[in-house]
Amino acid sequence: MIKIDNLKLSKENIDILSEYKIELTAIKLKKIDTTVESYIEDIYKYLEYIEEKKHIYSALNIKEEDIIDYLTYLDKNNYEKTSIVRKIVSIKLFHKYLSEKYHIEDISIKIDKPRVRRKLPNILSIEEVDNLLDIELNNAFDYRNKAMLELMYSSGLRVSELVDLKLKDIDLDNGYVKCFGKGNKERIVPVGELAVEYLKKYIYEYRDSMKKGYYTENIFLNNHGKKISRQGFFLIIKDIAKQKNIDKNITPHMLRHSFATHLLNNGADLRTIQEMLGHSSITTTQIYTNVSTDILKENYELYKRRD
């Protein structure tokens, strides 16, 4: 977390940034703290450049060409396009705030965000998923891992949604889970039969032995009897992939991407996938159509070589 009082900026810019942080925190109460911190860090780096390179010591005196110079500097120093876009959003929000608070011109109004081609998500083939999920079941931890992987692949949950699941959030008789996604938005997601089978096995036969005397509503527990963390699950899936000799840099999110792509390839419509993934916009979901097209092209090229 940035401590504004310790920043190497002019006193005026420190005061402006302090007031801006208070304003941001007030209007973004429903957002996580890291969102505000990210905005503030972006603006600190921006003002630091403006002071060092342009010798302008008040944000109120910045001109449009100064913003352009800063963005050019970022581009020349090989910042990722996505990072530059985020910084532009931060800068435009900051100058909009300055314009409204100090009744000055919004000099960022003509600054456009560059178009960024979204990177296609990495996915696993159905064979790789089957291999990953084919776990040897010898103890409570194996059954927990099996239940988590089956649930994630059959429902497309985010990792945070998976590890946050509580006993009251699941209806195994009807095959549904209730989860809370971005913005604490609730959605109900159907769960596959295999996932239900291994969830029942884990919860009814093994979970109690993992509690270590703690009481918790969280379904998935670590070896200390507490809620498993996102990082904990990340390490588990890495270890399983290594044991299975899967030659890919597997992350938990790849299961979510694979779930969506395999659904689409098997005829599911985008709206259904959007609802299951919890995307607020179908534009986000449409990225999977590009993945499917790429797979189709690869298969076509493969068959061409066989002619």
Where are these regions (language model features)?
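Conserved catalytic core of the tyrosine transesterase superfamily
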Residues: 1-307
